């Protein structure tokens, strides 16, 4: 069984974990077009998900939350990305569950008390998978919390479906 975590933000990620070997099969920074404004690369998202077999995969999609301090475009893009990914999953007949950030964070990150869930997910994934490179690209200096959040969601997915 494969377990997939999807952080659907523009700076999110998609991580696929093999349930038998407990290893990371693939990880992808959320595909986007960058220009004056960042937009989702819907074709690339479809390509990432196209090889998944509906009978052998469980997916967790993070519920979109709009922050009160977000601007109009940020709020729109949050909902847009959430809807686009739900549409792709439905069109491909892939089984998925929607989870709130609080649910997966409380389960996977319990015992980590930095007060910053992004740092906690980076620390958790770096410890759990020390050989994985959590940067968005080889040139990146910072670790990508969208990837680590997606990994945590994939591990949460395994817990709720077992």
Label every PLM stretch briefly.
Residues 1-162:
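Phosphate- and other anionic-substrate recognition elements at nucleic-acid/protein interfaces
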